[in-house]
Design a protein with these regions (language model features):
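N-terminal core-binding DNA-recognition domain of tyrosine recombinases/integrases
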Residues: 27-42, 52-145
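Basic/aromatic DNA-contact patch characteristic of tyrosine site-specific recombinases
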Residues: 1-41, 45-56
Length: 148
């Protein structure tokens, strides 16, 4: 899984390639959509890397991105906090990766926006975006399920 920078006369964009060096078509279309709504180069790059991390997680779990569940999103957050729990090989030289809650929230925002794009473009029947951003009935203040 890797990110490829693509330059054209219209500017720079990014592609996410799977393990077979094939583009993940819906992710590429989403990144192109970000270009059409005039997102900055740094924003597009940040979104590309966040989506890549999500696709790495899905690949490690052998889950198709169109078949995710709420539990997969929760597990993805756990995976971002402790990615080495999912490896079968231990290393003495490994450094634990420290990801801040802010980075986790940014990544989940990118992922939820990607799923909103898929829903609005009729590639998914389930609206994960609304589900992930539902207001709690116990609080007047908004807190998403990603709140930590």
């Amino acid at each position: 899984m890797k990110i490829v920078e693509v330059k054209s006369k219209n500017g720079t964009n990014f592609m996410i390639l799977d393990g077979n060096n094939e583009p993940i078509v819906d992710a590429v279309r989403y990144l192109k959509y970000l270009d059409s709504v005039k997102k900055s180069l740094n924003t597009k790059k940040t979104y590309a890397y966040a989506l890549k991390n999500f696709f790495v997680y899905l690949e490690s779990k052998k889950i198709c991105y169109k078949e995710v569940s709420f539990d997969n999103f929760v597990d993805f957050i756990r995976w971002m906090k402790t990615p080495f729990e999912y490896e079968n090989v231990l290393s003495y030289h490994r450094k634990e990766k420290s990801i801040s809650p802010k980075t986790i929230n940014l990544t989940m925002t990118v992922v939820s926006n990607f799923y909103d794009y898929l829903y609005r473009s009729k590639k998914l029947d389930v609206n994960f975006y609304d589900f992930m951003h539902m207001e709690s009935k116990y609080s007047k203040k908004y807190k998403s399920f990603m709140h930590h």
